[in-house]
Amino acid sequence: MGNCCSFLFNNSDDIDEQTPLLNNDGIQRTPPSAEADMSLRKREEEEEWESKVYDVAKNKFIDVFSLRLRTEAPQRDPRDNIYEEVLDQIDSLNLDPKYDVAKPTEQETEFIIRKLGVLIDDINNIKLSDKEIKGKMVINLSKVQPNITGSPS
């Protein structure tokens, strides 16, 4: 290992090899300031809290949209099962033509009307969030014509 400035001081590389690095025995290290100590403690507390959150999150549900930890399973709306119920009802229908029964029973009619009403309400209540695209330009790329002439004038 040579000293890059040895030619300026007329020192040879041998001197650099023989000179050990200075030790820190006589230098007293200053303890961390109270502010640095508090920030270190805060970071340790944050890391501990994060590890607890991750541990709890393994067994709990996380609301990914708000990124808040849920402490219990989300409550399901009873209307959430309507699609499965309708499919079960459709699967259980006997589609063989029966000439003696032309209309569904009153109970079946009420059930179908109620479920279709809930389905229509759900469709009408769907609102798209524009938070993701607010302030961004949305372009249909199939309608964009390339500019062959170069830079716009």
From Swiss-Prot:
Signal sequence coordinates: none
Residue ranges, annotated region (Disordered): 16-40
UniProt-recorded name of the protein: Uncharacterized protein C29A10.17
GO biological process, any: regulation of TORC1 signaling
Domain of life where this protein originates: Eukaryota
Record's compositionally biased regions (Polar residues): 20-31
Cellular component annotations (GO), alphabetically ordered: fungal-type vacuole membrane; Ragulator complex
TM region positions: none
